[in-house]
Amino acid sequence: MRQIIASVLAFTAFTVTAGEIPLLQSDGLAAIANEISGSNAKKTVAELSKHHRMRVSEGFSAATAHIISELTRAGLSDVRIERLPADGKTFYGTQRSRPAWNVRFAELWEVGTDGSHTAQIASYADAPITLAQDSASADLRAELVDAGSGTAASDYEGKDVRGKIVLVSSQPEAVVPLAVERFGAVGIVSYAPNQRTAWWQENRDLIRWGHLDTFSPVRTFGFMVSLNQARAFQERLMTGESILLHARVDSSTSAGAYEIATGTIRGADPALRQQEIVFSCHLDHPNPGANDNASGCAAILEIARTYSALISNGKLKPPSRTIRFVWPAEIEGTLAFLVARPDIVKNIKAAIHLDMVGGGPETKAIFHVTRGPASQPSFINDVAEEIGAFVNAQTERFAMTGSADWPLIEKAGGKEQLGARFVPMTLGSDHQIFAESSFGIPVIYLNDWPDRYIHTSHDVVATLDSTKLKRSAFVAAASGWILANITATDARQLWETVKSRSLARTATMLRERRGLIPQEAATRTRFHLWHERTLAESLSRFFTVPQDVSVEIWPFYDELANLAGGRSTRAVPPDRVYRRNPALKGPMSVFGYDYLVANFGKEKTAALRLLKHQGARGSGPEYAYEALNLVNGRRTTGEIRDALAAIYGPVTAADVAQYLEALAAIKVIQ
């Protein structure tokens, strides 16, 4: 074992410090690094961020048209728009399609005592983000009433809001049941703050993206204002002043279609060209939506252009596997695409998803190379981490000394180190759809977090860094190129990469189990060893592992198990075993629709303890996502509990059983 550890540590030191990447020849590294342009990507961000890119909208269509034009100009194959019905009736697995929502006009004015407009509060034409998504048409004048958060009955005590507009600190959707449905308010003005980070509410001029429930029978409108505007209103209301507002919204909801731009670089190997590596992003989000997620969309467009240009000029050979690029709406568009195109899904070997990859220093962004779910281990994440470590080392050296083989900088960009973090699976974007056990596609997720301007009026192009865009695109492009070309001849180098990172993960596991009771520590250890063996087995998704490599793999994990120790066997008591309903694909919570709530009931869902559980390394939504992933027709409920405890921290068997019983009740599992 000492010899194994020594060889792995030596290999790791080489890959981090040398000016090359395993599995990517030096000429390929140079070609991609020199061609890929963060400045080009930033120009694309500027173009996309002009549009208010709501799903199934005129703004989204305009952004899609730009992508199609650029793909055609870059010379990609199979360039087209995939159109899938979005009418509020059609289902794509667990996603109820959401219809088109378009706005022709929306303004909010303060009205003087003489009935004339005295001050414009919001204008859709000037800033579309000021109108909450899915707002209904209205043309009315009403007094403004401060209703606090707007989500508690106590917020309305002693206040008459019937026929009036409420000023609230919560998202409009959360306010509707009480303010509009119960107490009769006719509209909402919200100053919901930016998402909670260390910089929460620090900038009082931010305007947050607002939402209303697409499918609610209670139709209303919501305007979004800054904290400064809200405080100014509140100061006047506290003195007893009456504030009259005129709200006018001209919007429509209609049957439409999810538009998904796609194009390919066709594989050249007759034996492998049917297989696909997919690059994805999500094209929707409000104007400006620069980092979220015009940045990811621009980055994969730049990767497509880079590959195509390098192949055309002979600096790269065509890939062995086909490389596909897709630009759907977040979550719902991706799920619709995967459900509607099983002919494509069956050929996808891996996906690389980019969501927020350009945040400069002002955004406070930290770049993450994020793994897929622990329930579905894959070596592709080790490949991405290896490339991320290479870029970290190169950019740190450049920042500290002014010299590096591959600084990966842009003239107009920053010179700071990338500082990428390598982290386990987190939820929050389309990667969780690819990886969901309905599809089981291994995924690499590249993303920024935190971002102080996410979902606000300040998510603008000026806060992005062209150097950051170049580096994040390079990590993705290098990962994708390796995956598009690896064969059994690369098994040795891949195994060395997996081996080194397996040891690092084992060290992390040993630290984490120290504070656990013996039973949970043993559970953590058993799952870890299963995870590492399964990760090595994932090589076979791409090729048959050669005998000279496979004979090393299992002895290594036997020795690793002996080194780790503390894995006492657990007798598996008789327990329920569930399997997925193959006719229903997707997770329970998607975009604008919750399958569990819709079918199990709101009150009954709220009583599910697993959804509220807070573990050492995850919370309710993560536990629920992985619980469904772990259902495979073989694991017992107790074994699923053990796996969840190992991934996120101890949880009771009763809580897991209750959740699985709820899924069985609505025929998600059987």
State what each model feature region is.
Residues 122, 220-225, 230-231, 328-453, ...:
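Metal-dependent peptidase/peptidase-like ectodomains
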Residues 28-35, 49-58, 95-96, 131, ...:
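Second-shell loop/turn segments in exported
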Residues 46, 56-58, 119-221, 288, ...:
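Extracellular/luminal Protease-associated
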Residues 465-538:
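Charged, amphipathic alpha-helical linkers/stalks
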Residues 619-670:
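Long, charge-rich, low-complexity alpha-helical segments
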Residues 124-155, 209-292, 302-305, 309-318:
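Soluble metallo-hydrolase cores and metallopeptidase-like ectodomains found primarily
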Residues 21-25, 37-60, 70-78, 95, ...:
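Catalytic-core environment of secreted peptidases
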Residues 19-24, 34, 38, 46-162:
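Noncatalytic luminal/extracellular "stalk/propeptide" segments of secretory-pathway proteins
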